[in-house]
């Protein structure tokens, strides 16, 4: 009887290796992730990218090569590859990290490129974002620069549910630049409490002792008339 834990562990390792291979080969295509699904007729591989055409290639040539690599190197049975576009790429941390790394390799100033990426992320509806660029930014000594806006969770239950984190590498003349992008997805925050406004109720004003005041005033008038007489 096969070991169930070992079986799923091996499948997870294969998926991680495929993900690392695709991230290394197709970071220019804004690679976002992969899903490996077992089907009765083989293995279905779904690749998400910001630029699917760069992975597909002319006439689907790259897909045929990928199918051979998945079958021979990673041991997938009859791989069926599907390449699809990413929904809301500005809210995908890996896509934005690769975009920022490509911008740095093209010669954009790191601070300007980071501000542009941050603006695109926040305009897409993110609750918060954090961008960290490390390397020999301005001097020969390596350092890092951080840009943060909005809400970014560092721990707790919200970290796994709402945070998307990715790391990319840019190869420049001064050396290797590291890029880290953290995005807080626009989901419902569990620890946020909104107080309901109480319905406005018209205030009732009650007037008392009106009759007593009138009687006392009449008595005082009669008394003053009697004194005059």
UniProtKB/Swiss-Prot annotation:
Recorded GO CC terms = cytosolic small ribosomal subunit
Listed GO MF terms = rRNA binding; structural constituent of ribosome
Instruction: Identify the residues that the record assigns to the KH type-2 domain, covering every copy.
Output: 18-87
Gene3D superfamilies on file:
3.30.300.20, Ribosomal protein S3, C-terminal domain
Its Gene Ontology biological processes? translation
Annotated keywords: Ribonucleoprotein, Ribosomal protein, RNA-binding, rRNA-binding
Q: Which domain of life is it from?
A: Archaea
* Keyword flag Ribosomal protein: yes
Q: Which NCBIfam families match?
A: PRK04191.1 (NF003219), uS3_euk_arch (TIGR01008)
The entry assigns this protein to a family as follows: Belongs to the universal ribosomal protein uS3 family.
Describe the task this protein carries out.
Binds the lower part of the 30S subunit head.
The protein's name is Small ribosomal subunit protein uS3
For this protein's source organism, the top of the classification is: Archaea, Thermoproteota, Thermoprotei, Sulfolobales, Sulfolobaceae
């Amino acid at each position: 009887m096969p070991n169930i834990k070992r079986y799923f562990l091996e499948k997870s390792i294969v998926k991680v290796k495929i993900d690392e291979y695709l991230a290394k080969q197709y970071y220019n295509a804004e690679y976002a992730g992969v899903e490996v699904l077992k089907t009765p007729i083989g293995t279905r591989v779904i690749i998400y990218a910001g630029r699917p055409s760069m992975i597909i290639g002319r006439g689907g040539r790259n897909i045929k090569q990928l199918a051979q690599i998945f079958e021979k190197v990673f041991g997938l049975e009859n791989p069926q590859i599907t390449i699809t576009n990413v929904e809301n790429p500005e809210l995908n941390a890996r896509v934005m990290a690769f975009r920022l790394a490509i911008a740095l390799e093209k010669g954009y100033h790191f601070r300007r490129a980071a501000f542009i990426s941050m603006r695109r992320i926040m305009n897409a509806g993110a609750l918060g974002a954090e961008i960290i660029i490390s390397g020999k930014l301005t001097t020969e000594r390596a350092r890092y620069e951080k840009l943060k806006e909005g809400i970014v969770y560092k721990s707790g239950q919200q970290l796994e549910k709402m945070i998307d984190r990715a790391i990319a590498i840019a190869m420049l003349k001064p050396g290797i630049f590291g890029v880290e992008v953290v995005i807080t997805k626009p989901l419902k925050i569990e620890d946020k409490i909104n107080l309901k406004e109480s319905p406005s109720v018209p205030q009732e004003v009650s007037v008392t002792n009106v009759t007593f005041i009138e009687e006392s005033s009449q008595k005082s008038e009669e008394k003053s008339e009697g004194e005059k007489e």
